[in-house]
Each structure stands twice: as structure tokens, then as C-alpha cells.
Amino acid sequence: MSLLFFFAATVDAHGPVRQKAEEEITINAPAEKVWVIIKNYDDMSWLPAIKSTTADKGNDKGSIRVLTLKDGGTITEELKKYDDKKMSYAYKITDISTLKTITHSGAEEKVPVFPVDNYAASIDLEAKGDTTVVSWKAGYYRAYMNNNPPEEMNEEAANSAVTAILKSGLANLKTLAEK
């Protein structure tokens, strides 16, 4: 009987699970035209949620960029890989500012403006004649790394936030590139 209780308790008590999101869009424009819009690591003007971007080393690996959000707050990212010929780059989030503080399970918890942890992503373009397929992939954990997360930092909050960013970014990129 005690073995059964132990098994049931361990199944219920688990931490966060790595999440994955991928969005893809076909743009009716040549890859070179699309790449010109997104290739500069220090320019995220194509992403609707971003007010401004600064980066310390441009498109060089290790470049740190700070995204200032239109709704307030910042996200700091590091460029991990950049390939101009393949029209792709990869980055990871290194810091996220706090949106608010809540009390959860008797403790004060800082809710980040983007409810994820250990977030890494890549953007890849593939030329298909006069069209371009843009793929944006992300891997991440929910923001709350312990068991019993608050609503603001659970898997659903993380998945919703990531999906919204990827979809809105790609939709706006399509609009800009097809002008």
C-alpha cells in the first residue's frame, strides 16, 4: 500500500516540462526581400510588441540585445548563431523584467513580462521560387519552476504568450514583405 501511495505522489508532484512551439508562414515575396526585413539583430521593428531594440555587437555571435516592449518592460537576448547565407539565426533569452509581484503559496513571486524560463528560439527562411517559408521555433519552460504554478506563470500562460508572439510577428512580417 505504501508503494502505491509513493507512486501516486510522485506522478502528481512534477516540475515544469520543456515546451515547444513552432509557427510557419509562406510569404509571397523572394527570400532576399524577407531577409532584409529581419536580418539585423538590432532591429525588431517588424515585431508588433516591440517599441525599440538595442544590440551591442550587431549580428555577431554573442551580441546582446534589449527589447523594450510597447506595454512596458524589457527582454534581454543573446545571439547564439547567425548565418547570413542560410538566412537564419538563433537566440536565447537571458533576462526578463518583472511585470508585477503576486503572493502565491505564502511567498512573494515576481511575474515576468514574458512568462517563460530558459527560452531559446530560431528563425529560418527557405526560398521557394518567388515565395519564402519562414519558420520560427522556440523551446522553453513555464516561468514558475516549482510545483503548483500560479496562473500567470503556468504552462498555459507560457504557451499562449509564445504562440501570440510567433503568430503576430510572422503575420506582420508577411504584411511588410508583401507590400
Language-model segments: what does each one mean?
Residues 1-6:
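Bacterial N-terminal signal peptides
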Residues 30, 37, 75, 158, ...:
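Stable alpha-helical elements in mature extracytoplasmic
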Residues 37-47, 82-85, 128, 169-172, ...:
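Structured segments of extracytoplasmic/periplasmic soluble domains
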Residues 45, 53-118, 133, 176-179:
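Glycine-rich portal/gate segments that line the openings of hydrophobic small-molecule binding cavities
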